Regions:
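Sec-dependent, cleavable N-terminal signal peptides
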Residues: 1-8
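C-terminal amphipathic alpha-helix
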Residues: 6, 16-56, 60-65, 72-75, ...
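Mid-chain, structured segments of secreted extracytoplasmic proteins
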Residues: 76-113
Length: 214
């Protein structure tokens, strides 16, 4: 006996009825969504480049790859780019605030890499505590300082913690010359960064619908 399925089995509408209209997504919303993803992919790409160039598995502070300075400069520029991305919606002051917070995020991460490289446990603990405190400050900025906010403090805190935890896994894998683990950690960082980018772009699009009308 043949099994016959109508389209209503998948849409949940009665046979012959008109399905509800799908929401129309404007080209400007798609462009913004993709641009935000590009910014956060730049963030993790240049962060990874810096991690590799630090050569954390070589316990000599004088040993780094020659591209470290250029990679760091590009990574710091990415923080400016991310801050600039929210200026059309939240203004220049808020954009500059986000850039400053993200600049500290990168600067402290550099301290962590240096401490890990030379095996300075005390310096690592100090920098790591400040790194997570800075992540909380970023979460507060996204959830409380911006008006309207991009999500709850709990959501933003979890997002930032996941980002730091995944990046730490990447550093630890390289420290231990665990190249398979390093690749797996980067895949995790990449997926998490895309989720973070989507959370931010979706929040802005929802908060400023007039700027993204079809």
């Amino acid at each position: 006996m043949a099994l016959r399925l109508s389209s209503s089995a998948f849409t949940g509408t009665a046979s012959g009825s008109t399905p509800p209209p799908r929401p129309v997504i404007s080209q400007s919303a798609v462009t913004f969504h993709d641009a935000m993803r590009k910014l956060w992919e730049d963030h993790i790409t240049w962060t990874r480049n810096v991690i590799i160039s630090f050569e954390v598995n070589v316990p000599d502070s004088s040993v780094t790859l020659p591209d470290l300075g250029a990679a760091l400069e590009r990574l710091f520029q990415n923080q400016v780019d991310i801050g600039d991305a929210i200026k059309p919606y939240y203004g220049n002051q808020r954009g500059d605030q986000l850039t400053a917070l993200l600049h500290d995020h990168i600067a402290i991460a550099g301290e962590i890499l240096q401490a890990v490289k030379v095996g300075d446990a005390a310096a690592y603990e100090d920098a790591n505590a400040r790194w997570y405190a800075n992540a909380h400050d970023i979460a507060v900025f996204l959830s409380e300082t911006l008006d309207p906010p991009l999500g709850s403090l709990a959501e933003m805190d979890a997002m930032m913690k996941d980002h730091l935890d995944a990046t730490t896994e990447e550093v630890v894998a390289r420290l231990n010359s665990n190249w398979t683990g390093d690749v797996a950690a980067y895949d995790k960082v990449h997926n998490q960064a895309l989720q973070m980018a989507d959370m931010l772009s979706n929040g802005i699009i929802a908060n400023f619908p007039a700027k993204f009308r079809p």
